[in-house]
Amino acid sequence: MTSPDERKSFWERHEFKFYRYGHVYALIYGQVVIDYVPQRALKRGVKVLLIAYGHLFSMLLIVVLPGYFCYHFRTLTDTLDRRLQLLFYVSFTNTAIKYATVIVTYVANTVHFEAINQRCTMQRTHLEFEFKNAPQEPKRPFEFFMYFKFCLINLMMMIQVCGIFAQYGEVGKGSVSQVRVHFAIYAFVLWNYTENMADYCYFINGSVLKYYRQFNLQLGSLRDEMDGLRPGGMLLHHCCELSDRLEELRRRCREIHDLQRESFRMHQFQLIGLMLSTLINNLTNFYTLFHMLAKQSLEEVSYPVVVGSVYATGFYIDTYIVALINEHIKLELEAVALTMRRFAEPREMDERLTREIEHLSLELLNYQPPMLCGLLHLDRRLVYLIAVTAFSYFITLVQFDLYLRKKS
């Protein structure tokens, strides 16, 4: 006979290891607030030291190092190839947007420290317990999305590390200054700082999607039971039981919506920064590919340029799946509303059961996907818009490139 552990999926056996890895990696960057699934409470003294370290590390990124790189700005962009210099300017702008996102992330984490812990982390843990006995089919897509995100992020980290080593190897040849290597490391740290929070937000939204799907399955099961009601002496008793269960489901649905709303409210400015960074990354990617194709042979293309192009593509995919999760949440809410419209009314409808159905239907009308800063919906349309906008700016860069080529 197989043991219970052998019947578990790989994710179920190692789930908490993934969460612990994410928490430890966030602690390296001073983000104590990021704890996917709290497993062991930190001692007060250790927590105070980690918070102090987080403030010092953030001040180093926000105040000290930018001054150093601004002082060496000319060194960062100095090159005899004017077309390559244009690429440096675009990359510098990309890092500047990451820097602004880091500032927003630091302020948000500081201001919403307790709120993120209570309204996101603990609320998600509470909902996980509430849906412990719910249908487990929605866990499989959730596991896939988490696997994919984990592999993609680690692949992007390895690509950036390879790019840094490539630049470091060229320093000895005198083709790239030491300052540019430092700047590449700085950009890598900025990306990790913002990505930690983006991954946490992705985790919360992925959990919201899973809970909505489990909620919809429970709602469908309850609907099937209502369809099976027959007139008789126990009808009112069954209606009372169904009313209690529907009231419980309505409370859970409200908690799921509150979790998504609070997560968006506290992370919306960081997500806006992520969208802007994606825009510049796509612009850099388009122009990098053009820069490669404009060369007479691929042998003349530097290795960091190729690595940067691959990284920008991965960054776009990363942003796309973040938006895709929100797209699926919107579709799942529509599916829940459809399930509610299909509720059958027994011949002798209990007044309380009717009231619960009406209350849940009315609440679902107000459960619209939250907007970023009240301006934009984070869905696939926004990602497509970013790609089109980046391509439009890319055409402008190509015009500058052609002008510089003629001038040289």
Swiss-Prot record:
Entry comment describing in which tissues the protein is expressed:
Expressed in the medial aspect of the third antennal segment, and in neurons of the terminal external chemosensory organ of larvae.
How does the protein associate with the membrane? Multi-pass membrane protein
Give the Cytoplasmic compartment stretches of this protein.
1-20, 70-86, 166-270, 326-381
Provide the family line: Belongs to the insect chemoreceptor superfamily. Gustatory receptor (GR) family. Gr10a subfamily.
Q: Where are the transmembrane segments?
A: 21-38, 49-69, 87-107, 145-165, 271-291, 305-325, 382-402
Which superkingdom does the taxonomy of this entry point to? Eukaryota
Keyword Amino-acid biosynthesis listed? The answer is no
Classification via InterPro entries: 7TM_chemorcpt
Descriptive protein name: Gustatory receptor 10a
Residue ranges that the UniProt entry lists as topological domain Extracellular = 39-48, 108-144, 292-304, 403-408
Native species: Drosophila melanogaster
Q: What is the lineage of its organism?
A: Eukaryota, Metazoa, Ecdysozoa, Arthropoda, Hexapoda
> What GO molecular-function term can you cite, just one?
taste receptor activity
Gene Ontology CC terms, in alphabetical order: axon; dendrite; membrane; neuronal cell body; plasma membrane
Subcellular localization, as worded in the UniProt entry? Cell membrane
What are the entry keywords? Cell membrane, Membrane, Receptor, Transducer, Transmembrane, Transmembrane helix
Query: Which Pfam families does UniProt cross-reference here?
Result: 7tm_7
Sum up the protein's function in the record's words: Probable gustatory receptor which mediates acceptance or avoidance behavior, depending on its substrates.
GO BP term, example: monoatomic ion transmembrane transport
